[in-house]
Amino acid sequence: MRLTICPRIGYTVFVASVGLFSFGVEFQADLVIYGSSPAAVSAAVKATDMGLKPVIVAPARHIGGLSVSGLGYTDSGNTGAIGGLARDFYRRIYRAYQRPEAWKWQKAEDFKEDGQGTKAMLHDDGTMWTFEPHVAEQVFIEWMAERRVDVRCGEYLDREKGVVKQDGRIVSVATLSGNVYKGRYFIDATYEGDLMAAAGVAYRVGREDGSEFGERWNGNQVGVLHHKHHFRDWRISPFKVPGDPSSGLCAEIDASAPGVRGKGDRRVQAYCYRVCMTDDPRNRIPFTKPEGYDPARYELLARCYAKGYDETFRKFDRIANHKTDTNNHGPLNADWLGGSYEWPEASYARRAELAKAHRDYQMGLYYFIANDPSVPEKVRNAMSKWGLAKDEFVENGGWPYEIYVREGRRMVGEYTMTEHDCLGTPRHSAQGRSYGPVGMGSYSLDSHNVRRYVTAEGYVQNEGDIGVGVKNPYGIDYGSLVPRKAECENLVVPVALSATHAAFGSIRMEPVFMLLGESAATAVAFAARDGRAVQDVDYPELAARLRADGQVLEMGSCKK
């Protein structure tokens, strides 16, 4: 197989057959993987190791999803529940930072080893759980190059008519370029579930009614105030002129009624960009005023500052080389509430518009904090020391390549993961056929806010944010990765998998997607060997192979 040179952010690497310029060509593979998330990479690596010929087909030019787009402060949960190739990834990250040349802007000994629920570096284990985006991308590229994985970038699935099915199986998928990818089996590794939906597989968008599966943490969460992403007891007026309803609502407020706790809807938790910032002036791009900037969008934040809000920098999470993975924190933050509702089912053109709108909102927020006179001077001065990291996302002016799609479509599969699986409460009879675990989750039930509304008392408040602790790691059932057999027999979905909104809030972490991608490819290898539907894979054999490959399937195997 011919190797094509693929330049990436300041260095040259080699990836097998990265196709950007061929059109109207037919390709044949054992396994076609659509998407660029970490699950796509782990699936391709595992498929190759098991003797299959995979191809990754992805719209993105950078493979690795959010792990290469700013999410470097890993939501690891219990690190002992992360095994197999996913753990190998974090070991490779650790080894990358053992090289002196990795520390360009900071001495290694000056790095504070803090992480999300764990140390950034676990020296005894040889793993590292925080990293710069370009380092993650280099690891993924080297991983794929070692196996000569065929990667086709810049390829958008024709979602209207590109999926050809015969006798309940996908035969081929076509992209908007006119290329056709034929395969025996397929994996949807997108955050949105685009291939799954185009193949006619049932899915959900938004929040189920809590009564459907007997869940407490699903549906409308009005009155639930977890974390600190809300307006506390400040009694902030939602109106442009405080206390005057005739003046109209401030920007970024949903005019709908508070609603009923537990009631389902199609609202989607908020997205943001995980921005890689730096306070090192040698490597900093100052925040600039975005197109269409309007400080009125951030009026509610100004009112929070007037009430004494002082947590602006709470989620400027430090990674190596004086950089951050900057997430959201506080009552009005980087999450653009309401901007996510359309995304899962939107056209590519509409998603591009929404991505720009998110960027303008978020860049406007940073500019507002650094410049607006309503912001306390000490906060403005502190914010002005921050900017985008010049050596990250170089092709994109220091801004992340991808928005953080925290939740898109969710498949309705053979089994539906619910909060009961995560919390250890009795399963609901409607969850479907259970096979057994093919990986573990351990993060809390975590949903970001869904909307900002006016309370019955006439004040502004947020709704949808939950953070419910998971006592122990739990198994993620193989049945949640496969569609109902009547809908498709040769597709596995390790990212937009079958889970309720509540359960997905725990599952939806990058290392979990990575380990599920490996499990999906392992299942495909057995299905291909036996000529079976993915729903008919021998689970005991699958589980045995996963354990042999270092995957963690039960709590007794977990080690911190």
Predicted regions and their residues:
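Flavin (FAD/FMN)-binding glycine-rich loop and adjacent Rossmann-like elements that form
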Residues: 137, 153, 171-172, 179-185, ...
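Conserved N-terminal/central alpha/beta ligand/cofactor-binding core
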Residues: 52-53, 58-162, 204, 212-214
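Bacterial N-terminal signal peptides
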Residues: 10-20
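Beta1/beta-strand and adjacent pyrophosphate-binding region of the FAD-binding site
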Residues: 27-37
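Aromatic pocket-lining residues of Rossmann-like dinucleotide-binding sites
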Residues: 47
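Boundary at the C-terminal end of the N-terminal hydrophobic targeting segment
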Residues: 22-24
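N-terminal Rossmann-fold NAD(P) dinucleotide-binding loop
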Residues: 40
